[in-house]
Amino acid sequence: MSFIDPYQHIIVEHQYSHKFTVVVLRATKVTKGTFGDMLDTPDPYVELFISTTPDSRKRTRHFNNDINPVWNETFEFILDPNQENVLEITLMDANYVMDETLGTATFPVSSMKVGEKKEVPFIFNQVTEMILEMSLEVCSCPDLRFSMALCDQEKTFRQQRKENIKENMKKLLGPKKSEGLYSTRDVPVVAILGSGGGFRAMVGFSGVMKALYESGILDCATYIAGLSGSTWYMSTLYSHPDFPEKGPEEINEELMKNVSHNPLLLLTPQKVKRYVESLWKKKSSGQPVTFTDIFGMLIGETLIQNRMSMTLSSLKEKVNAARCPLPLFTCLHVKPDVSELMFADWVEFSPYEIGMAKYGTFMAPDLFGSKFFMGTVVKKYEENPLHFLMGVWGSAFSILFNRVLGVSGSQNKGSTMEEELENITAKHIVSNDSSDSDDEAQGPKGTENEEAEKEYQSDNQASWVHRMLMALVSDSALFNTREGRAGKVHNFMLGLNLNTSYPLSPLRDFSSQDSFDDELDAAVADPDEFERIYEPLDVKSKKIHVVDSGLTFNLPYPLILRPQRGVDLIISFDFSARPSDTSPPFKELLLAEKWAKMNKLPFPKIDPYVFDREGLKECYVFKPKNPDVEKDCPTIIHFVLANINFRKYKAPGVLRETKEEKEIADFDIFDDPESPFSTFNFQYPNQAFKRLHDLMYFNTLNNIDVIKDAIVESIEYRRQNPSRCSVSLSNVEARKFFNKEFLSKPTV
């Protein structure tokens, strides 16, 4: 069924760039001067340079002993038309030791008109003539997608998934409870969320997914969103060749085996040498490399060791026929000098797209990490492997890598690991790279001789590999400092115009002082939280830092709360650390509520005092108080990590009887002095794995009726409000743009 998507009619303002094409055709009478020509015949080549654009230097091949070379080589530059762009042309002579400059010339690009194409002669040393063909055109098809709407692939997925879910819900609920499902318009959008929490979150989420799969709930979900540790399980599951034909049960058996080994086994000298040498290839190609790259390799070797070449794009085959929920992953873009609690841009990843909803900018997954300028790729690299993204999504653990491996001599002294993570800020992992220089491993300017080039590159590689090896296999500064550990990629928004930016809910009024003040009356009272969330990123910085989203709050609600996704029911699983098993479990959920309110996104009121009234439970349900008024507000079923009924029951309604059955379930999660479920435990013996896995498997199955009842209510809500999260086109026309002045924090 076709429908009108109002978000397609919101214009995301962006400036078009120019593509300047230069064809180096030929030169005649190339000379080194009378005396120079007597000693040697020139070996000419041409360098082109425009300082105002990335990937600014280009060069032709050289010809040996040729004074009339014909190159006929084409080069492209992406330019900002508002800059003073000047082409510098240098005629060079290739030599064995150091190349020689034979002459230079300049050409102002502004002298050309858009659509113009012409040949331009340049004279060097009053003798040599070089002919360049130049053309200038508008880049009308950028590589970034500028839109507030979901991409067409996700829209197609949603429609196919609704068809599948309609039948699955009828099967799950039975004919009586599903009688409101007349068409796909009545199908509610269900999302499953997993929090961060290291391997604890990953193992717990594995039990959750097994229960959801076997109960049929997973077949009724449209999305599954993860953060940090949960993304590691999602990556393991979705990259597995047998999923979704086979369920999580067999895959979880493999996972249990993989995480039972000591992580130090990944750091044998031979393996480390292989890691570092593979990263040299990335660095030498011009991409930034940080410790997060290495951490991603270690996570990949642990969890997806037989599929290290997998990419995010390759997961599309799992969801193209809408056979399973669309996986959504996340990280943060942060600034070096600002706390991530004050400023952070949420970056979302799916097999279809990567981007930032705040700016309405998205790209195909294989372009993430490539060099962009004004929305156009100026240098494309191979798609980053999935394990690199796994390192980025869980990069908080690369900060305290010595604690993860247990190589620190002080690991049992002073603060606990959870307390250390609590105190980490983006400043600990983001180096303030003021130079912002490119990372290409380049030799001296003009070096062309192959032997000299190989020797230069070999020396560079040997030095870099040696430093990394020494850092990893010894208790060096790399283990004792936290600087520069964030993931780093080329800034895909470099050169864009951010005079206009967009709230996540673009159709809501951001200019009301009263409404803003009302939102500050939230359960989490720290006034600094999210204070600068409306600020734009730095479009002049060549690279951006991407870190673990758990450093701001530990639940991936921003992915699911995008109104374009129209989610009716959210089933969230929180594996976050708590001071003790009896501590209130709502800290992260309250932060998510505050973030949602400050972004004017509908969110049910979270009452933290329900813990005082009802005590610790396996899950809590939060609904809109007035569904008739709060038509766009989702219902949330919030599962927490708690061992309550599992101690008595081995399955829902089936009591434990034997001593062994009771002992295996008699354990604490956060109060155990041995800390087997610590956030920083990266080795799970089989018993610890089974305990945590089976606990969350039980807790989920024990509350399946709660989930089913919420689905039935969501069907009714959807039936009563078929145009949920939609707006009239007249409203869209009236609100095409939101200027930054309306998005800045109101002053009192």
Curated annotation (Swiss-Prot):
The UniProt note on how this protein's activity is regulated states: Activated by cytosolic calcium, which is necessary for binding to membrane lipids. Activated by phosphorylation in response to mitogenic stimuli. Stimulated by agonists such as ATP and thrombin.
Q: Which residues carry this modification: Phosphothreonine?
A: 268
**One GO CC annotation, please?**
nuclear envelope
Gene Ontology terms for molecular function: calcium ion binding; calcium-dependent phospholipase A2 activity; calcium-dependent phospholipid binding; calcium-independent phospholipase A2 activity; ceramide 1-phosphate binding; lysophospholipase activity; O-acyltransferase activity; phosphatidylinositol-3-phosphate binding
Which UniProt keywords are listed? Calcium, Cytoplasm, Fatty acid biosynthesis, Fatty acid metabolism, Glycerol metabolism, Golgi apparatus, Hydrolase, Isopeptide bond, Leukotriene biosynthesis, Lipid biosynthesis, Lipid degradation, Lipid metabolism, Lipid-binding, Membrane, Metal-binding, Nucleus, Phospholipid degradation, Phospholipid metabolism, Phosphoprotein, Prostaglandin biosynthesis, Prostaglandin metabolism, Ubl conjugation
According to the UniProt entry, which residues carry Phosphoserine? 2, 434-435, 437, 505, 515, 726, 728
User: Where on this protein does the Glycyl lysine isopeptide (Lys-Gly) (interchain with G-Cter in SUMO2) crosslink form?
Assistant: 540, 605
C2 domain mapped to chain residues: 6-122
Subunit structure of this entry?
A: Interacts with KAT5.
The entry's free-text remark on domains says: The N-terminal C2 domain associates with lipid membranes upon calcium binding. It modulates enzyme activity by presenting the active site to its substrate in response to elevations of cytosolic calcium. In the presence of phosphoinositides, regulates phospholipase A2 and lysophospholipase activities in a calcium-independent way.
Active-site residues per Swiss-Prot or TrEMBL entry: 228 (nucleophile), 548 (proton acceptor)
Residues the entry annotates as binding Ca(2+) 2: 40, 43, 93-95
Q: Where does Ca(2+) 1 bind?
A: 40-41, 43, 65
Q: In which pathway does it act?
A: Membrane lipid metabolism; glycerophospholipid metabolism; Lipid metabolism; arachidonate metabolism; Lipid metabolism; prostaglandin biosynthesis; Lipid metabolism; leukotriene B4 biosynthesis
Residue ranges for the region (Disordered) are 427-458
- Residues covered by the PLA2c domain: 140-739
Q: What is this protein called?
A: Cytosolic phospholipase A2
Q: In which tissues is it expressed?
A: Expressed in various organs including uterus, kidney, spleen, liver, heart, lung and brain (at protein level).
The Enzyme Commission number assigned here is: 3.1.1.4, 3.1.1.5
Q: Which reaction does it catalyse?
A: a 1,2-diacyl-sn-glycero-3-phosphocholine + H2O = a 1-acyl-sn-glycero-3-phosphocholine + a fatty acid + H(+); a 1-O-alkyl-2-acyl-sn-glycero-3-phosphocholine + H2O = a 1-O-alkyl-sn-glycero-3-phosphocholine + a fatty acid + H(+); a 1-acyl-sn-glycero-3-phosphocholine + H2O = sn-glycerol 3-phosphocholine + a fatty acid + H(+); 1-hexadecanoyl-2-(5Z,8Z,11Z,14Z-eicosatetraenoyl)-sn-glycero-3-phosphocholine + H2O = 1-hexadecanoyl-sn-glycero-3-phosphocholine + (5Z,8Z,11Z,14Z)-eicosatetraenoate + H(+)
One Gene Ontology term of the biological-process aspect is: positive regulation of macrophage activation
- The superkingdom of the source organism is Eukaryota
What is this protein for, i.e. what is its function?
Answer: Has primarily calcium-dependent phospholipase and lysophospholipase activities, with a major role in membrane lipid remodeling and biosynthesis of lipid mediators of the inflammatory response. Plays an important role in embryo implantation and parturition through its ability to trigger prostanoid production. Preferentially hydrolyzes the ester bond of the fatty acyl group attached at sn-2 position of phospholipids (phospholipase A2 activity).
